[in-house]
Amino acid sequence: MFFGGAGVSTESGLPDFRSVDGLYHQKYAFPPEEILSHDFFMARPKEFYQFYKEKLLIPGILPNPAHYALQKLEEQGKLKAIITQNIDGLHQMAGCKTVYELHGSIHRYYCVKHHHRIPEEEIDFSTSIPLCPHCRSMIRPDVVLYQEGLDERILSESIAHIQNADLLIIGGTSLTVYPAAGLIRYFPHHGNNKLVLINKEEGRLDTECDLVLYGKIGEILSEVVS
């Protein structure tokens, strides 16, 4: 099992929301946490999409060695599933098959009125507020905003995978975003079951792990595969 966060995608050029140089430490008219909330989206969709298109829809982003290393482990039958807090879809772009996106995906959209699913390529992002071609209501990304709960099916299936894992690798996450970070407690960390952590710096979970590796996750996972 692999459980990953924003640090998995930083080597692709995406910002880590909570690092020192990350998105949440930059200055905007509103705090990013407020902009990326349900209430803000409903009240100020124009400002929401301005931020969303500028900071989350970054063109030319491609999978990095970490994504491809995980795909290789999955292909070899050594990795049963990937649970990610990321919304960028890079695991699937790298060819990974069993991916649970706890916070949704920027590649899926639906309208707020009737939940019509709108293919990404059919959305006109040149407008200030994209509208549904069927009912003309607002379109929103299928991502979990602040004030919203996680998808129950994805949550329960993720927990089941963690409970059945004999090795859990955690990478690129500060484990500060709940309820996603709380899933780690479902891992049966006893007997021969091992917990491995890969991060660039020290964190609160280090002392509980059987192995902690500090460094770039792409380089470390590539070495594991080779």
Give, region by region, the residue ranges found by the protein language model.
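Conserved catalytic core of sirtuin-type NAD+-dependent deacylases
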Residues: 1-226
